[in-house]
Design a protein with these regions (language model features):
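Active-site-proximal beta-alpha core segment in soluble small-molecule metabolic enzymes
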Residues: 2, 8, 13-17, 21-24, ...
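Active-site anion/phosphate-binding pocket segments in diverse small-molecule metabolic enzymes
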Residues: 2-23, 31, 73, 92-94, ...
């Protein structure tokens, strides 16, 4: 997180994304995997809440492509001018195949039937289509089975005359559990599958067995890496470590300051009753903006460099905090939900623990009403609102 201050952008609620931290993280990852490996930035789920199109533009040539989960995300990037490789990691609906081929979107395949449909669409358009071959080595999710039937399917896919199979990949299931034998077992299964596939004449240039936890916990393997959570300076497990910088801060502002007398209740259901005379501030952010409602009466925010506990039930658009120990709080003051203000920091992981969830869930849940503000050199470089077309 950049600096030691809360930036006031003038918005109701906003997420600051530190581009200098983002590029630092990419540099650290690049140094770990070497210059020859291909980097694919995973920007599904709106780049884990950080803003997909905007991040793609800032990443530029630091990565060799982008990965999304579905066709809608892929076509959204294309329509906003993002060029280069975009790969859909999930399944493709049959009706979307011609459009994906037309827009040069790479597709993940795990059946010869789907591969044939992509192949037919490519031939009908007089072009070639790029595919990524998914292999299930233990995640029990998408992918070819690692048996004779799966091998036959893979060979059929690789023989399609209008397809370029750019990468074969598999996804670790337990890489965040260092003591688990599953990751090593998956690697061996994957290596055997590739070896037998190549013995049958198939050649696939890029090989990938990774996620953020695997890269940090098990090091290099293959020559293509998909960068997800760690790109944003967040770690997939507490036992993993890296010299990464969190890129995201989440802030809002005070809408009203009040004094409550002993016995007065706060918010829906009066789940908090003032034990004495207290001073409160209402903030312009709620669970519709991504703040977990499970933080009601738990956790807190930072305002003027001091900690302010959350009072009562978090509302859809607002929340209330105790500012009794903070002097001179006024309407319009900035409150930090995630990030640093002065000497205090609230991390994504702090919130995830209180909400009994994972850091992925917190950042992916940041809502559309929260303006994304992109910071370079400690200053606002650009901003994007999903609901206000004047902020783009």
């Amino acid at each position: 997180m950049f600096g030691g201050f809360a930036l006031d952008t003038g918005f109701r609620a906003w997420a600051e994304i530190d581009i200098d931290a983002l590029l630092h993280n990419i540099k650290i990852i690049r140094s770990a995997i070497g210059d020859e490996a291909e980097l694919i930035a995973v920007v599904k789920a709106n780049a884990y809440g950080h803003g997909d199109t905007q991040l793609c533009r800032y990443l530029g040539d630091t990565v060799q492509g982008y990965a999304v989960a579905c066709y809608d995300e892929a076509i959204g990037l294309r329509r906003t001018g993002i060029s280069g490789r975009i790969v859909i990691l999930g399944a493709i609906v049959e009706s979307c195949i011609p459009g994906a081929v037309k827009d040069n979107i790479s597709l993940t395949v795990f059946s010869a039937d789907t591969a044939k449909k992509i192949n037919d669409a490519a031939k009908a358009q007089g072009k070639r289509a790029e595919v990524f071959l998914a292999v299930d080595t233990g995640m029990s999710r998408l992918g070819l089975s690692c048996d004779e039937a799966g091998l036959c399917e893979a060979l059929k896919i690789c023989s399609c005359d209008a397809l370029d199979t750019h990468c074969i990949f598999s996804h670790p299931a337990c890489a965040d559990i260092v003591s688990s034998p599953v990751t090593g077992r998956q690697k061996k299964i994957f290596e055997t599958f590739i070896r037998v596939l190549e013995q049958h004449g198939a050649h696939i240039e890029r090989k990938c067995f990774d996620n953020s936890a695997a890269l940090l916990g098990y090091g290099r393997w293959g020559n293509l890496y998909k960068l997800g959570l760690i790109m944003h300076g967040l770690l997939p497990a507490e036992n993993l470590h890296a010299d990464l910088i969190p890129t995201l801060s989440l802030r809002t502002r005070v809408s009203q300051v009040k004094t409550l007398e002993a016995g007065e209740g706060v918010s829906y259901g009066h789940t908090f009753i003032a034990p004495r005379r207290i001073k409160t501030a209402t903030l312009c952010i709620g669970y519709a903006d991504g703040l977990p409602i499970s933080l009601s009466n738990r956790g807190g925010v930072i305002i003027k460099g001091k900690y302010a506990p959350i009072l009562g039930r978090i509302c859809m658009d607002q929340m209330i905090i105790d500012i009794s120990e903070i002097d001179d709080v006024q309407t319009g003051d900035v409150a930090t939900i995630i990030g640093r203000d002065g000497e205090l920091v609230v991390t994504v992981d702090d919130i995830a623990k209180l909400a009994d969830t994972i850091n992925y869930n917190i950042v992916c849940g940041i809502g559309m009403r929260v303006t994304r503000v992109y910071i370079k050199d400690g200053k606002q470089d650009s901003a994007y609102s999903y609901v206000n077309p004047d902020i783009r």
